[in-house]
Amino acid sequence: PSSGGAVLVTGIGEGTGTSSSGYGVLVQSGTSITSGGTGTLTVQGTGSNLATNLNRGITVTGGSIGSAGGDVTLIGQGGGAGTSQNGQGVRVDSAGVVSAGGNGNLNITGVGSSATGSNNAGVSLTNTNSRISTNNGTIHLVGSTLGTSQPGVDLSVNGVVQSGANNTVTVTTDSYSGDGTASISAGTGIVNIRNRTAGTLINLGGADVLGGSPLTLGLADAELERITAGTLEVGRNDATAAGAITVSAAISPTLASNLTVLGGGDIAIGADVTVANTLVLAIGADVTVANTLV
């Protein structure tokens, strides 16, 4: 660990022939990368491009990456080729922890492999006690893949994303997978699940569309019900505005008091939307309502 200065760690996975596990940066159980004081911490990793498995950019498996009080930034590029698997950009599992202490903010950017095998998400968090968290700072996850078969952000098996002191959690991706056990929490603050690419369609209650153009960011009700926030924001209406938004199946984000839907195109509400307090539609075109807004 540093005593307060900035820390930069960079790793590039290598290998020859059929060797696998070409991690860019690997932090295993019992090991850590840390910065002290208010020093910033940046970790960059690129996985091997061999057509083998486990060529992740950054892997935190049982170990930890964190600061005492500075900002933390992880940037991972998954490797692999052909049908290889586990080429995630950034992977946190097996009770691994990535955290920012004090007033530090946490930013994680992961790009998954172009390979067609499984588990090639941009940012992946899985397993009980695996956590991405801050003490009193924001969290921003940015996930994408070079392929067309895996989500940009994949949260599963009790993985937790949690900001401290009700700070904002932002997830920027064109495809999202969250199972019925993983969770995101900003306390009474804001969680924003938004598209990465301008014009990406959003389907509330539906599934991702991972190929073609435009892509579709699908957010099923079961995924939305694992998000705790004062306000859940979906989409964006800035220079990278979402395209048309559809509510294709009933949604009721029960752990979020308010729901704001942001976009640059039309919104077609074809199923029930149930919100505890306030629903805001901040979009750039027409609103069509065929079902109940509660």
Where do the language-model regions lie?
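Extracellular lectin-like interaction modules
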Residues: P1-V294
